[in-house]
Amino acid sequence: MLSREDFYMIKQMRHEGAYIVDIATQIGCSERTVRRYLKYPEPPARKTRHKMVKLKPFMDYIDMRLAENVWNSEVIFAEIKAMGYTGGRSMLRYYIQPKRKMRPSKRTVRFETQPGYQLQHDWGEVEVEVAGQRCKVNFAVNTLGFSRSFHVFAAPKHDAEHTYESLVRAFRYFGGCVKTVLVDNQKAAVLKNNNGKVVFNSGFLLLADHYNFLPRACRPRRARTKGKVERMVKYLKENFFVRYRRFDSFTHVNQQLEQWIADVADKRELRQFKETPEQRSRWSRNICSVTGYRLRYQLLRYPPCVLGQLYRGWW
């Protein structure tokens, strides 16, 4: 088989008027080959031929390992080499490659929860103008798993107290609490997560105990478990914070957010359900009712003379 350079030389010499016999002499091939190549619009692809003679005795073993979901060719190569295989790696890869389409998918299967069962929590960050100054705004997104309704709380810091305040505000906004709250492995909620053995932050456990929800943490390096809320973080960045870039204060940011959610976000159609979050929220009315919860850093805003009154009642 001739090379690509030979192919283009044949085309060029013929275009310049050279005889086929002269082209064949120059290239070093037969006149018949020259005529065949002149008919091709492009250089013919070189076919790689792999002889599987050396690999054939080990094919049953390789197929067994693939069925066990072992797809690393280096691992299989080492194993069959120890069994007496004398061929190379390329032959093994050539055999495995067409079978890779049989490999089980790594895609996460979306888990749909029942109404009032789960809330997913996550944080995002954008840079906007607040009170005439460019600054970073941290925003907590709390999304109901069933209806996809969400609440957003903007804060100057992404810390434990603002994490808890975002959940308190979300429960108050939704009119109740859910059975489980799914969080990322942020220090505000999770101190340690070792293969499912989770140590939660004591402050987060106090909040969970007060609202009677079960805290849950994502598996490490698998944040896509809470894909619903991560999509809402992206949705906010690409919609609300593109439309609104200037605010008078953080209070103004949160007012604008709640208004935008009511006017826009809750009225968007969810393609997989052909309903809006507002329509699906009618099924979430069975979420548990809540009482107020006062955060430690909020108490510091008041003088000692009124703290006693605040401790006697929840807002």
From Swiss-Prot:
InterPro entries referenced in this protein's UniProt entry, alphabetically: HTH_IS21_transposase_type (IPR017894), Integrase_cat-core (IPR001584), RNaseH-like_sf (IPR012337), RNaseH_sf (IPR036397)
Gene3D superfamilies, per database record: Ribonuclease H-like superfamily/Ribonuclease H (3.30.420.10)
Highest taxon, organism lineage: Bacteria
One Pfam family per UniProt: rve
A molecular-function term among this protein's GO annotations: DNA binding
UniProt KW keywords: DNA recombination, DNA-binding, Transposable element, Transposition
Residues of the HTH IS21-type domain: 5-66
GO biological process, one term: transposition
Domain annotation Integrase catalytic: ranges: 111-285
NCBIfam families: transpos_IS21
Function as written in the Swiss-Prot or TrEMBL entry: Involved in the transposition of the insertion sequence.
PANTHER family: INTEGRASE PROTEIN, TRANSPOSASE RV3428C-RELATED
Family: Belongs to the transposase IS21/IS408/IS1162 family.
Protein name as catalogued: Transposase for insertion sequence element IS640
Organism expressing this protein natively: Shigella sonnei
Gene for this chain: istA
